[in-house]
Amino acid sequence: MKIGDKLLKQLNKTYTPSVTIPLKFGRYDLIIKTDEYGNPILLFIGKANEEGIIKGERFSRVLIKDPDGKVIKDHWDNKGKV
């Protein structure tokens, strides 16, 4: 599975720092974990069961910035099934 442009637009937003956020995106359930700055760094996408646990795929974000805050690297890696 690939992350599409519409989902990337949703993931490039800034959220509340250091939280787990459940979302719906089309027919998929998402759980986003954010870092201390509110950037999404972990994504679980698939179908949630009645306990809210996602069965699908896990993505991890590589976000590297220089000391001035300019983004050097920013991409999502598929880490496999969950």
State the predicted function of each range.
Residues M1-E51:
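Extended, compositionally biased eukaryotic interaction scaffolds
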Residues K55-V82:
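Short, compact, well-ordered microdomains
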